[in-house]
């Protein structure tokens, strides 16, 4: 994916490898968001996947939301994010799975309401 060289360059210039091979990118993504840079990533995702039908963009709660939102601007579609906990106001019908957080070195149980992901939709 040569198109994402902008991301590779940003990681090389601003990212830090922490013990356990965890990539720290808090200067532009998960503590402070470099909005113009993330917007450029959104454009790159549109270039990479623009020839495909996309109805929604799915990400996980936290660091993925910024990238997903700015990518969604270029696709003109909504963003759905997997929540790390099902609150009392969440629908009972939901998709659920476990994902590994390498940042926190633990598995998280995540959920998405079935109300927002329908059969036949094309999800990026």
Task: Map each language-model feature to its residues.
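Short, glycine/charge-rich flexible loops or terminal/linker lids adjacent to PRPP-binding catalytic cores
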Residues: 78-123
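Short Gly/Thr/Asp-enriched flexible loops that form oxyanion-binding sites at enzyme active sites
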Residues: 66-75
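Short glycine-rich phosphate-binding loop at a beta-alpha junction
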Residues: 53-61
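Short glycine-rich or small-residue beta-strand-to-loop segments that form or flank ligand, phosphate
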Residues: 58, 123-124
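Active-site-facing substrate-recognition patch
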Residues: 1-54
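A glycine-rich, hydrophobic loop/mini-helix early in the fold
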Residues: 44-45, 58, 75, 81
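Short, flexible loop segments at the rims of nucleotide/cofactor-binding pockets, characterized by
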Residues: 33-37, 58, 100-105
